[in-house]
A protein has these predicted regions:
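Short SAM/SAH-binding signature in class I
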Residues: 77-83
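Active-site beta-alpha loop architecture of Rossmann-like, nucleotide-cofactor-dependent enzymes
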Residues: 87
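SAM cofactor-binding core of SAM-dependent methyltransferases
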Residues: 17-66, 81
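C-terminal target-recognition/interaction regions appended to catalytic cores
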Residues: 2, 264-431
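Class I S-adenosyl-L-methionine
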Residues: 67-77, 91-302
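Short alpha-helical patches at coil-to-helix transitions and adjacent helical residues
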Residues: 23, 162, 169, 362-370
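Extreme N-terminal starter segment of soluble prokaryotic enzymes
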Residues: 12-15
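Conserved alpha-helix/loop element of class I SAM-dependent methyltransferases that forms part
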Residues: 2-10
């Protein structure tokens, strides 16, 4: 497999366009599946991580790119992917998008049926949270491709969001199947589901609403096949769970297993020994979030269990090596590489820029991304060899990093101005 830096010399052959690309969860997934990708990302810090990782990037606002710079997107792109920012829809956010869910469904239909985009934008603005409008961007990108000369409709579409967005994905699927209005007769096979990440080998409990759409003739779309059992701490020993119910036998992966495995890899920044007591993993984690609606009732996970959902506040979770540390109120914190491993990023992924915990928490878990993208593009699960290779990120030459930065941010007058409030870039050697 070619290293990610080979994408720099020419953008020809890029197949996947990742909207709201973040530090690169879907791009990492695409890389290990053998597909070239390019991401559009607003946040400069996430862009710095992407450059360091050798990921082709345009530092820009997704809506500005669509309106004013669409011709810069390689014509070879066949797959539209992305996860619009979830804060306005998430149970961990303020919920403006959740309150407006029914209205947003109508916006989707209004957009497809050709109503004035200016009026739609004004109505979206009146919802009070500008991020809510971003969930329409993938549909707007598809319409732009259909209505632009010498462009083709995307062959596949892959979207993910928090579970509360599933009703919107269902409306997306409805209009994609219809091919009506501004879709100009271009119909898609489309399905959507809520997936649990621990059932796909991610060592954390996280649920995501996923939509997969393909042009007709590329095969029926079926739900990605789970590879691991779901986590339920009330069932007792995970290895005694009834695999007949779920059709798989492999238990979910624990925090201890994931961190131990990463620690054993050559040159790993993950040091599992710091979490051991007398040679064994006994640590436990107290969540930054309350449970059962009580903010004072912080949840607890043992090292033998998957992590809580890794959010942008992951650095606030308290990690205790043992009961004595807890009683002495001497907590530790997960490092950024450790948090990345719990998201299934490669152990040596070159996190860069500021707000790295936020970057980690905002990302799509690459292992889940591999399963979803492989399902969408091949109709099958990723191979064992591909999943195994995804543990380590290839080295990226410094010259490649600089070339990517020049492509993504060379003309800073076109970059989102608010996103330049970052610390000076630290030069780093190739990982």
């Amino acid at each position: 497999m070619n290293g990610p830096g080979t994408q720099v010399q020419h953008l020809d052959g890029i197949r996947v366009l990742d909207l709201f690309a973040g530090p690169g969860g879907l791009d990492v997934a695409a890389h290990f599946l053998g597909y070239k990708s390019i991401g559009i990302e607003w946040d400069r810090n996430a862009c710095e991580t992407r450059y360091a990782a050798g990921l082709a990037t345009i530092h820009a606002d997704v809506s500005v790119m669509r309106k004013n710079r669409f011709d810069e997107i390689p014509r070879s792109v066949e797959v539209l992917a992305g996860g619009p920012p979830c804060q306005s829809f998430s149970v961990a956010g303020k919920g403006a998008g959740l309150q407006a869910l029914e209205r947003v469904k109508q916006f989707i239909r209004r957009l497809v049926h050709g109503e004035s985009e200016a009026e739609i934008d004004e109505d979206l603005h009146n919802l009070g949270d500008p991020r809510t409008a971003l969930v329409l961007e993938p549909l707007r990108w598809l319409i732009k491709a259909i209505e632009t000369e010498e462009r083709e409709p995307y062959k596949a579409i892959v979207l993910e969001q928090v579970p509360t967005v599933l009703p919107l994905w269902e409306v997306y699927a409805e209009v994609l199947r219809s091919g009506e209005g501004r879709l100009n007769g271009h119909k898609y096979e489309a399905e959507c589901w809520v997936l649990r990440t621990e059932q796909f080998g991610v060592p954390q409990t996280r649920t995501r609403a996923v939509l997969v759409a393909r042009r007709p003739g590329l095969g029926a779309i079926v739900r990605p096949t789970a590879t691991h059992l779901p986590f339920d701490r009330h069932r007792g020993d995970r290895r005694k769970a009834d695999s007949r119910i779920f059709g798989v036998e492999r238990p979910w992966i624990s925090m201890a297993e994931a961190l131990e495995s990463a620690s054993e890899l050559d040159g790993s920044p993950v040091d599992a020994s710091r979490l051991r007591t007398n040679g064994s993993m006994e640590f436990f984690v107290i969540s930054n979030y309350g449970s059962g609606g009580d903010p004072k009732n912080r949840g607890r996970r043992d090292s033998s269990e998957p992590a809580f959902t890794v959010t942008g506040k992951v650095s606030r979770n308290k990690v205790y090596r043992n009961k004595a540390d807890f009683e002495a109120n001497e907590p530790d914190r997960f490092t950024i590489p450790e948090s990345g491993v719990l998201q299934t990023f490669p152990h040596n992924f070159p996190w860069s820029g500021k707000d790295q915990a936020q970057q980690v928490g905002n990302a799509v878990p690459p292992r889940l991304g591999m399963h979803v993208l492989s399902n969408a593009l091949r109709g099958e699960a990723p191979s064992t060899e591909e999943l195994r290779a995804a543990a380590t990120w290839p080295a990226v030459p410094p010259a490649t990093v600089e070339e990517l930065r020049a492509i993504g941010c060379g003309d800073q007058s076109r970059c989102p101005p608010e996103s330049h409030k970052v610390s000076p870039v630290r030069r780093r050697s190739a990982p």
